[in-house]
């Protein structure tokens, strides 16, 4: 998977996670809030993975 793909999927997961958290909070559904937080963290991880891939590629390109 490319770094851009990781970043895009990460942003999407983070956004969906935020929505789930908001809906869970509004409906007093703690399970949905927890699912949203987990999905948000997954998205943050995917974005970080994309950033690392970019950094590695830039490092390799310098060699």
UniProtKB/Swiss-Prot annotation:
<comment type="similarity">
    <text>Belongs to the UPF0337 (CsbD) family.</text>
</comment>
<protein>
    <recommendedName>
        <fullName>UPF0337 protein PSPTO_1596</fullName>
    </recommendedName>
</protein>
<dbReference type="Pfam" id="PF05532">
    <property type="entry name" value="CsbD"/>
</dbReference>
<dbReference type="InterPro" id="IPR008462">
    <property type="entry name" value="CsbD"/>
</dbReference>
<dbReference type="InterPro" id="IPR036629">
    <property type="entry name" value="YjbJ_sf"/>
</dbReference>
<feature type="region of interest" description="Disordered">
    <location>
        <begin position="20"/>
        <end position="63"/>
    </location>
</feature>
<feature type="compositionally biased region" description="Basic and acidic residues">
    <location>
        <begin position="50"/>
        <end position="63"/>
    </location>
</feature>
């Amino acid at each position: 998977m490319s770094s851009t793909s990781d970043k895009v999927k990460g942003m999407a997961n983070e956004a969906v996670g935020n929505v789930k958290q908001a809906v869970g909070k509004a409906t007093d559904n703690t399970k949905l809030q927890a699912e949203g937080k987990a999905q948000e963290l997954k998205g943050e991880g995917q974005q970080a993975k994309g950033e690392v891939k970019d950094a590695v590629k830039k490092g390799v390109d310098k060699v």
